[in-house]
């Protein structure tokens, strides 16, 4: 019998956005495609990670704000069915749950194109999607709801999107302060999405100076920092995990994912097994890709699952143990790529183990 992740205090708290990814037809435009060619999938990076952890059997909580609408209710049902702790979820009766338009290439790669219903919220409160429920996360509600969850937690998993509006940025700061007071480490997946900051932004734009200034304090509080390769270039001018760690005062563990090119990481001087400061690298698994949406979130869920099971991985674990954890995380991401959407294809522990056995 599988254990219920919600039956114990969460080891990971995932804080941030829950939304719908509206996937356009492969090679088509989600803004103009007819409804029958669109594929709506529940998503949002922290919600994806929470669902992935629960699927693997790690006790986890999701903290976010949902619109009191059909999408929000569907999300609450899904999270509850997965066994995610929802005791700190907030509900918004004024703002809708966000729908993100996702353009897919014929090869399954995705590009974020803005938001459905953007005209309804444009011009209200400063940044792209500032009137959606996820951007109105309330610090006052967190002050009461979060401490009981932190009592048994090892990790607070966050992204940068809450910084895009004043209310959710304040709530994020509150969560970070509470986590620090409880000795809970921060896992930051930057998840840079320009259109969440400015609906008119180029989806491929790098962070500007003002945004970098706002991101820097967040980067400096991470114990574990996960970046896509293009995010690493945009934020640090390098894809080298060692160089990235050295540029931050706390010297975090750093993982840089690069799609089909694989993963590079640095968990300390012993990561490579050479005794010197150089990153370790693992090639990606070769799998048929249906949709890459959520692959990075599946990877992070797999890695946090391993870190909860073996807390010393980022400290003094031998290189082969660190590599095994990264390989497990890569398998989680590869399995997500073989289905549609970020959450539905997430694997159970037995499926990951079977995949690894089949890919020695």
What are these regions (language model features)?
Residues 1-13, 177-181, 239-360:
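Conserved phosphate-binding/catalytic region of the ribokinase-like
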Residues 1-85, 111-112:
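Glycine-rich phosphate/adenosyl-contacting loop at the front of the ribokinase-like
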Residues 7, 28-30, 130, 136-145, ...:
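Intrinsically disordered, low-complexity terminal tails and inter-domain linkers enriched
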Residues 20, 24, 68, 192, ...:
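Short, glycine/acidic-enriched loop or turn micro-motifs at the edges of active sites
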Residues 59-158, 353-360:
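Conserved N-terminal subdomain of the carbohydrate kinase-like
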Residues 98, 160-164, 333, 339-342:
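Glycine-rich phosphate/pyrophosphate-binding beta-alpha loops
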Residues 148-149, 217-218, 247:
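Structural alpha-helical scaffold elements that stabilize or flank donor/cofactor-binding regions
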Residues 155-243, 253, 261-263, 268-270:
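Conserved beta-alpha-beta core of the PfkB/ribokinase-like small-molecule kinase fold
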């Amino acid at each position: 019998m599988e254990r219920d992740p919600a039956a114990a205090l969460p080891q990971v708290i995932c804080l941030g956005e829950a939304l719908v990814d509206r996937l356009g037809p492969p090679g088509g435009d989600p803004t103009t495609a007819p409804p029958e060619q669109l594929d709506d999938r529940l998503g949002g990076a922290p919600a994806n990670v929470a669902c992935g952890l629960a699927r693997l059997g790690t006790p986890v909580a999701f903290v976010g704000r949902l619109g009191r609408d059909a999408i929000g209710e569907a999300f609450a049902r899904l999270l509850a069915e997965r066994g995610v702790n929802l005791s700190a979820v907030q509900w918004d009766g004024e703002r809708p749950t966000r729908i993100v338009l996702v353009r897919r290439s014929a090869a399954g790669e995705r590009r974020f194109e803005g938001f459905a219903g953007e005209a309804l919220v444009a011009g209200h409160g400063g940044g792209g999607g500032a009137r959606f429920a996820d951007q109105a996360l309330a610090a006052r509600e967190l002050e009461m709801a979060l401490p009981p969850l932190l009592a048994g937690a090892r990790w607070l998993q966050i992204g940068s999107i809450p910084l895009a509006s004043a209310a959710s940025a304040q709530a994020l700061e509150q969560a970070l302060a509470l986590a620090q007071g409880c000795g809970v480490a921060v896992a930051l997946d930057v998840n840079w999405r320009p259109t969440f900051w400015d609906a008119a932004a180029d989806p491929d734009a790098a962070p500007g100076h003002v945004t970098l200034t706002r991101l820097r304090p967040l980067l400096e509080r991470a114990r574990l920092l996960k970046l896509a390769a293009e995010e690493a270039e945009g934020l640090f001018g390098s894809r080298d995990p060692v160089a990235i760690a050295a540029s931050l005062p706390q010297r975090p563990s750093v993982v840089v994912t690069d799609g089909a090119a694989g993963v590079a990481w640095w968990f300390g001087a012993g990561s490579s097994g050479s005794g010197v400061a150089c990153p370790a690298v693992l090639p990606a698994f070769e799998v048929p890709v249906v949709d890459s949406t959520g692959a990075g979130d599946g990877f992070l869920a797999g890695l946090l699952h391993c870190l909860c099971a073996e807390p010393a991985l980022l400290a003094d674990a031998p290189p082969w143990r660190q590599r095994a954890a990264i390989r497990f995380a890569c398998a989680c991401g590869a399995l997500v790529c073989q289905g549609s959407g970020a959450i539905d294809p997430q694997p159970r522990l037995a499926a990951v183990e079977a995949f690894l056995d089949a890919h020695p």
